[in-house]
């Protein structure tokens, strides 16, 4: 006797690399179709300027290249006969998962920072105050040079998509994932317990680097302990999501959190 497969099995299971990449398609394409109309881009974005150069700074050629890259996202899955992963329901689930994680992350970071400030500083905003002061995890929307509320929100949404994709690519896939793999190999860490504690320590360091990233450069924020700690906790949450759920859920969570802060 055979039992029917659970239709949600593919949705809730951790995705493979190709599926993970394909599920970020709306984030990637949405950012690149929008950022071309803004005077700034995400600091981790190394693609937009290259695309503009290849397109000879022609708007229509740039848009065509962006859509072609988007098509390239899904082609490997289609060729592998895994087009089911591109069904609308899969993206809807990814968005819902991102919303849940973003809300939980904001609450967790708020509680953690409130506790930290109560221990090491005299500043006490209270939990509600910290929620209202929760910082963005991408470039400041004021940097986009918009002049009206609607324009600021649109720019904030676009920059949020870029932060979600590129900062997760740099900090979770690059610094945390690839960095840990290289260091484990370099130092010949083989025991399971050693690997675990190494990854925990490396995750904390990567989260601190991620947080510090937001204070660097002309458009960086002014440093303060509260926002640094808040972003560090968020970096740890993103790392947990990346480790146990994959790249796409981390991207969606990051983008949706920033949209919540910058555009809503």
Stretches found by the model and what they are:
Residues 17-33, 97-101, 202-209:
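Alpha-helical transmembrane segments
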Residues 23-44, 109-110:
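Alpha-helical transmembrane segments of multi-pass membrane proteins
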């Amino acid at each position: 006797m055979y039992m029917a497969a659970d239709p949600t099995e593919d949705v809730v299971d951790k995705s493979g690399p190709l599926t993970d990449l394909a599920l970020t398609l709306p984030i990637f394409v949405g950012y690149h179709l929008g950022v071309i109309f803004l005077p700034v881009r995400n600091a981790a974005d190394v693609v937009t300027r290259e695309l503009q150069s290849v397109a000879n700074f022609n708007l229509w050629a740039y848009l065509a290249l962006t859509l072609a890259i988007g098509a390239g996202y899904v082609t490997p899955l289609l060729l592998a006969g895994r087009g089911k992963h591109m069904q609308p329901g899969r993206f809807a689930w990814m968005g819902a998962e991102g919303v849940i994680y973003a809300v939980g992350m904001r609450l967790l970071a708020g509680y953690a920072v409130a506790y930290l400030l109560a221990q090491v500083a005299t500043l006490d905003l209270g939990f509600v105050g910290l929620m209202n002061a929760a910082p963005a995890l991408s470039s400041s929307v004021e940097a986009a040079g918009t002049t009206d509320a609607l324009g600021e929100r649109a720019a904030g949404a676009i920059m949020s998509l870029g932060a979600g994709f590129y900062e997760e690519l740099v900090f979770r896939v690059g610094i945390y994932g690839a960095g840990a793999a290289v260091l484990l190999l370099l130092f010949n860490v083989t025991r399971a317990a050693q690997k675990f504690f190494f990854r925990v320590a490396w995750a904390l360091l990567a989260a601190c680097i991620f947080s510090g990233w937001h204070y660097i450069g002309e458009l960086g924020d002014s440093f303060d302990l509260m926002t640094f700690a808040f972003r560090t906790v968020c970096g740890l949450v993103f790392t947990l999501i990346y480790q146990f759920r994959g790249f796409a859920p981390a991207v969606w969570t990051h983008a949706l959190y920033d949209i919540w802060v910058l555009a809503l």
